[in-house]
Amino acid sequence: MEIIKDIVSLIASILIFLGSIIALISAIGIVKFQDVFLRSHASTKSSTLSVLLTVVGVLIYFIVNSGFFSVRLLLSLVFINLTSPVGMHLISRAAYRNGAYMYRKDDASRQSTILLSQKEFNTPEELKKRAKLREERREKLYYKEKEYINKMDD
């Protein structure tokens, strides 16, 4: 019985360690990626997985060694896995609508800093101009789609 307890504790430790490694990779991605959208992708996907692995490892460890099942850990796991992607989606959507800089592959050879592209200026006026242009395009597509749906209904 003691051997099984040790094996399950080892599995829990491995899960916690993997969660820590994935959190480290997430932190590196946040620092290395070029724009808001890539950074949000790195932070959301991998941090959600790292929290999942870490909390499951802790839950298993406490169940085996203490015989203690924590509803708080389970609720925190559910809460984080539901709210983290939704929150980051809202942040990314707000950044997109405000005209935040988007990294492009052709910027890679000419890019001098992480935040700015040499092709375009990221002054507040330019950002507002791009956001307005995106909104106009979105409205045109929305109305075309609405007309198409109305035509199909008739």
Swiss-Prot record:
Domain of life: Bacteria
Transmembrane domains' residue ranges: 11-31, 51-71, 72-92
Gene Ontology, cellular component aspect: plasma membrane
Topology class, membrane: Multi-pass membrane protein
Molecular function per GO: sodium:proton antiporter activity
Subunit structure: May form a heterooligomeric complex that consists of seven subunits: mnhA2, mnhB2, mnhC2, mnhD2, mnhE2, mnhF2 and mnhG2.
Name listed for the protein in its UniProt record: Putative antiporter subunit mnhG2
Origin species: Staphylococcus epidermidis (strain ATCC 35984 / DSM 28319 / BCRC 17069 / CCUG 31568 / BM 3577 / RP62A)
Gene assigned in the entry: mnhG2
